[in-house]
């Protein structure tokens, strides 16, 4: 992995702002496979192989947080063979990649419900999270068995169990009960395969995010495409509800 963030090839005074937090809806694995006459699980395997170079691209660009939408609470409706295959693939990826990501300073976090997943997969996820918890180079959140509405409902349940009074509840308190507690909200949400919807992904956290869509299927999405999305993000103006525009993100690349 590169050790210094890029500056998108421009002089210092023109450098594009870099998003702190990029979230990606990794869509199109099945369609990528079908277009090649392959089984859907072959597309999911190709998609997982694409995660590593995108992580490297985030490090090279100086992005601090990457959140990957890997398996939604709605994906349980898919055929059992596909769901079980996804569990197997995730377990293999954890086994193959965790140690190297740890050596490179990447922190792994899981967002979503661990309960309901196979016990062996739960154990692997917990191991990866605990091993890498002190790393600071890049935080990678894997949203697996995750749904935005489910997250909000679960947060409300936890607040009720904790006995919070109505006057104690504000946005900051509510956010502290979400899976993303302690993390800044996504600045940029990327979706592959040409779709233009959130699909129940980070629906609280995405309130002021910028969106970027590409017709490329996830296995086709590369570092150059990530850089293109970040460059376009840097040229946008964000107002966060006010009249004052902020160009791109909230910080410039070093």
Identify the residue ranges that each predicted region occupies.
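Flexible, compositionally biased loop and terminal segments
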Residues: 1-254
């Amino acid at each position: 992995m590169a050790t210094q963030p890029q500056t998108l090839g421009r002089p210092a005074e023109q450098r594009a702002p870099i998003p702190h937090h990029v979230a990606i809806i990794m869509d199109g694995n099945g369609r990528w496979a079908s277009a090649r006459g392959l089984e859907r699980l072959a597309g999911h395997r190709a998609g997982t192989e694409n995660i590593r170079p995108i992580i490297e691209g985030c490090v090279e660009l100086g992005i601090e947080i990457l959140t990957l939408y890997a398996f939604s609470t709605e994906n349980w409706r898919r055929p059992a063979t596909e769901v079980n295959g996804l569990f197997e693939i995730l377990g293999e990826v954890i086994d193959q990649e965790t140690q190297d990501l740890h050596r490179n300073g990447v922190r792994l976090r899981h967002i979503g419900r661990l309960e309901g997943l196979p016990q062996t997969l739960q154990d692997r996820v917990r191991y990866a999270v605990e091993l890498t918890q002190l790393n600071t180079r890049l935080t990678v959140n894997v949203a697996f068995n995750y749904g935005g509405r489910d997250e909000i409902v679960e947060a409300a349940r936890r607040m009720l169990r904790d006995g919070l009074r109505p006057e104690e509840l504000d946005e900051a308190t509510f956010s502290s009960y979400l899976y993303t507690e302690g993390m800044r909200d996504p600045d940029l949400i990327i979706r592959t395969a040409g779709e233009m919807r959130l699909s129940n992904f980070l629906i609280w956290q995405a309130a002021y995010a910028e969106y970027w869509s590409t017709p490329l299927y996830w296995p086709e999405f590369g570092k150059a495409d990530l850089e293109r999305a970040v460059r376009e993000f840097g040229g946008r103006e964000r107002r966060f509800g006010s009249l004052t525009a902020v160009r791109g993100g909230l910080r410039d690349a070093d």
